[in-house]
Amino acid sequence: MTKLKVFLAVLLASLSLHIHPSEIDSLLRELDMSIRNRPQYTLKRQEQIDALQRKLRLSHSDQERYDLYRELFGKYRSYRMDSALWVANQRVELAKRMKNPLYVRSAELNIAEVMIGVAMYKEGLEILDGIKSADLDASGVSYYYYQYHQVYTLMADYAFSDQMKEHYRGLAYQYKDSIISMRRPGSQGYLLMMSEKLLYEEKYDEAIEILKSCYKTHEEKGYSVAIPSIGLANAYAFMGNTELQKKYLAISAIADIQAATKEYISLWKLANLLFQEGDIKRAYTYIECSMQDATFCN
């Protein structure tokens, strides 16, 4: 009986080793195909942008134009940063013409988002520091806190020293609680930020449980799974599980590519892992794709 148990344990371990790589191989092939099909995904997004621009040309009021520019900004963010900046500036001008301070601040936060997205952290912080949370509505305050969180997270990622990295990570952590307090408990935004907080606190199992729940919800509702997937990839990276890190980086990268997102991190992180494993050709393809999309995004 003992020998049978040992045999079954060895067999199951062997099977798991074969099942997991084949799953990753399948995901990588899907990612390869998605990269080849990038032009059609880009065309679809551009058609959505063109439709909004047609509505803008036919709009009859500043309020209608302001709302349409908000939608247009959403289409341009993570796609064409120079265009996103132009749209944000248009929103500022419209808001001033409408003499609506709340709208002005909202549009200025869009500009801060773009500055942060193109690594102009000083300029982004100057805009944020010039805005008071008391001058914003509830959704604006949440957005405001998130931009502070984002800039400090990115500054931590690219900090020169470990001391500076920890300093900026600490600043970003302070905003996690602020963001969580502004979001509806149980909502996807609430849960995703809670998972980030748990990762910072090294509570990896709890974070993974939340992220898997978010992943399932996003999948069921037809949302992009890019964000919960990159969260899971980060969690497994902290735990030293390279195989699951690769799996979720691949899933996140597929979602990004198919959504015609041009500003992303999953693909080049995956490329780095594959390069370390000796898959030089695929790593080169992924880095080349990332560079092309970064150039397109400006």
Enumerate the language-model features and the residues they cover.
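A "functional boundary" signal
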Residues: 2, 7-10, 15-298
